[in-house]
Structure formats: structure tokens, C-alpha cells
Amino acid sequence: MEQFHATTIVCVRRGNHVALGGDGQVTLGNIVIKGTVRKIRRLYHDKVLAGFAGATADAFTLQERFEAKLEKHQGHLMRAAVELTRDWRTDRVLRRLEAMLIVADTEHTLVLTGNGDVLEPEHGLAAIGSGGAYAQSAALALLRNTELPPEAIVKQSLEIAGDLCIYTNQNHVIETLGA
């Protein structure tokens, strides 16, 4: 059975100002099932942003578990991420989930992978999903060569990814923290 998948999620940081955005498309094989899915969420009293890519049901499951870890660790992003990925690696059911998360607060941006990795990306930016490489390239160029705020960089990066990746649309949700 084919999985629902494909998206673009991108996160850009300048100091404590961070923006996380994603498109709204969900596909099943080569068919667009829905174009308005919200893949970006605010968690833990609106102090943490999370975005997901991968199989939709798997991503929702991981996001819910991450939110529970955030509550358990009183919003401490790194501890919640490490504990979630530890569970992800050791739990037989979780190990089969096909999804990735980008999570961010005003101090850290982390990528949580299906291999149980917690990665803190360089350059203050991260991107995942089928259009992630396009969005990351665009964001890096804009970050290096402009003074645009993070949300403007995320918006332009998603637009470029949507122009190039057939699994990414132009229906964007962008959330920010700090300023």
C-alpha cells in the first residue's frame, strides 16, 4: 500500500528570531489528496515550533509523542528531543514510523530523524521533505546575502521549492518565535 507523503518544511534562524514554515500538500503516489494540511504547529505554551515531513499518520504520532516529552521536561527542547529519539530507536513500533521533525525554540533548532538522530544544523537553517534541498539552498543564499528577517526567507524559500518540487504547493503556513 502506498503511503501519504512528500512536503517541504524549512526553518531559518537569525539569533533568537526563528521562523518555521511548510507547504500544505499531501500526496498519495502521484495524486494530490489535499492541499491545505497544516504541518507546522506551536507546542508547549507557544514556546516551541514543530514541523513534520513524511508519512502523515506517522508524523502526527511522532509530534504527539514529542509534545508529551516537552511537557514532561517542562519545555526543555534538547532533553525532550533526546528522550523522544531514544524511544524512537528502541521501540519496535516507533522504529517503523517514516517521518522527520524540525523543532525549534528561541535558542535551538533541531532535526529529529527516523534513525533516532538529533541534529543541530549549521548556518541557522534546516529543511526536510521532498523539496527540502531546494528550500535549504534558497534559504542559505538569502541568509548569506540579504538582511531579510527569517519569516521572509522562509516564505521565499518555500515559493522556490514549490516552483521546483512537484510534491510541494504554494499554500504556506509560517510561524515565528522571538524578534
From Swiss-Prot:
Gene Ontology MF annotations: metal ion binding; threonine-type endopeptidase activity
UniProt xrefs under PROSITE patterns: PROTEASOME_BETA_2
EC number: 3.4.25.2
Protein's job: Protease subunit of a proteasome-like degradation complex believed to be a general protein degrading machinery.
Similarity remark: Belongs to the peptidase T1B family. HslV subfamily.
PANTHER family cross-referenced by the UniProt entry: ATP-DEPENDENT PROTEASE SUBUNIT HSLV, METALLOPROTEASE TLDD
The protein's name in its UniProt record: ATP-dependent protease subunit HslV
Species the sequence originates in: Bordetella pertussis (strain Tohama I / ATCC BAA-589 / NCTC 13251)
